[in-house]
UniProtKB/Swiss-Prot annotation:
Annotated keywords: Acetylation, Apoptosis, ATP-binding, Autophagy, Cell cycle, Cytoplasm, Differentiation, DNA damage, Kinase, Lipoprotein, Magnesium, Manganese, Membrane, Metal-binding, Methylation, Mitochondrion, Nucleotide-binding, Nucleus, Palmitate, Phosphoprotein, Prenylation, Serine/threonine-protein kinase, Spermatogenesis, Transferase, Tumor suppressor
Residues that hold ATP according to the record: L55, G56, E57, G58, S59, Y60, G61, K62, V63, K78
InterPro entries noted in UniProt: Kinase-like_dom_sf, LKB1_c, Prot_kinase_dom, Protein_kinase_ATP_BS, Ser/Thr_kinase_AS
Cofactor(s) annotated in UniProt: Mg(2+); Mn(2+)
Compartments reported by the entry: Nucleus; Cytoplasm; Membrane; Mitochondrion
Gene3D superfamilies per UniProt: Phosphorylase Kinase, domain 1 (3.30.200.20), Transferase(Phosphotransferase) domain 1 (1.10.510.10)
Record-listed Phosphoserine modification sites: S31, S325, S403, S431
Name the record gives this protein: Serine/threonine-protein kinase STK11
Molecular functions per Gene Ontology: ATP binding; LRR domain binding; magnesium ion binding; p53 binding; protein kinase activator activity; protein serine kinase activity; protein serine/threonine kinase activity; protein-containing complex binding
Amino acid sequence: MDVADPQPLGLFPEGELMSVGMDTFIHRIDSTEVIYQPRRKRAKLIGKYLMGDLLGEGSYGKVKEVLDSETLCRRAVKILKKKKLRRIPNGEANVKKEIQLLRRLRHRNVIQLVDVLYNEEKQKMYMVMEYCVCGMQEMLDSVPEKRFPVCQAHGYFRQLIDGLEYLHSQGIVHKDIKPGNLLLTTNGTLKISDLGVAEALHPFAVDDTCRTSQGSPAFQPPEIANGLDTFSGFKVDIWSAGVTLYNITTGLYPFEGDNIYKLFENIGRGDFTIPCDCAPPLSDLLRGMLEYEPAKRFSIRQIRQHSWFRKKHPLAEALVPIPPSPDTKDRWRSMTVVPYLEDLHGRAEEEEDEDLFDIEDGIIYTQDFTVPGQVLEEEVGQNGQSHSLPKAVCVNGTEPQLSSKVKPEGRPGAANPARKVCSSNKIRRLSACKQQ
């Protein structure tokens, strides 16, 4: 009998079964031949937004991709937990300040706040913002040189100055300009983000004097490194923009140190060198923006009039492309909400269960991004007309402005037909959007 030929167990005598070997009737397979079925992604709705995958995570919270189910616009949501914010110095105050600042800013080079939602039960806040495909720091880290070609750096720097000039015109000092806070859209538009440590000057302030700073150490000017009590806020942003320009054109930093004390000591002295391969006009601009004395430091007007800023630079090197997604290695950065959208529609047609997807209850929808808990009354103008100030238009979905939805008690399911109707409406709305 050939051992290689499988035989029924009953044909082997009891004493010969072990000598034949287990390989006779159990076929070994290689692990590469096993196909693992990935876990099905479960759709989750936060208000009208369908949640996607994680885009990034910082000290304040996570950032995920979302899809607006009404407009089909691709958005990003910053998820903030109140419990986590309490552990960060000035965490809650910084978030509240950022919302108050972003709600009144409208510029193509400043990130736009689209919506704010708050879950009182879970103590979570959702800041919905326009979607940016990549960050400048991520692009720099994707190439060995850690820098951009001069032509590409020039285009980004011009947009940075445009956005910075707008912020200063609104009386806002950013205080933390750096590549990590500069985002990019698919068409290369730069967006200044993260206004958590920014400061809004008083409308009747005589100058731009500031007294506090919480920016990144490597981008701070000498006046802050030396511990001055007061300093010019706008000149702080000019210095940080100069360090950013130095970094994206050389791949280096003008000041470095083994620790923050050594770093501030080097910044406080103000001595730095510029690589010899930098063109003279660029070197002159960098020295003007990184001037030790704030009074002699370039203003935005002087930057705009500089020859390097006004010059059209030829494309001498290949541009740095947007890198593939770090998790999925997707070079096109496709929408991560698609699997959740497919799961939502597919299961909606097959099943009549309420648990098709997760729905966050207790959401406070805010209009014009009113900070949760803030109550504003109508303001009457001099002409007698009332101007409605921002206020929450829906608390737990019970206000008449939106479709009524009373939060039920108990587990959703067949015992709660009202919830089933509400969920079906959401599914039909998303299905209609998909067909369009």
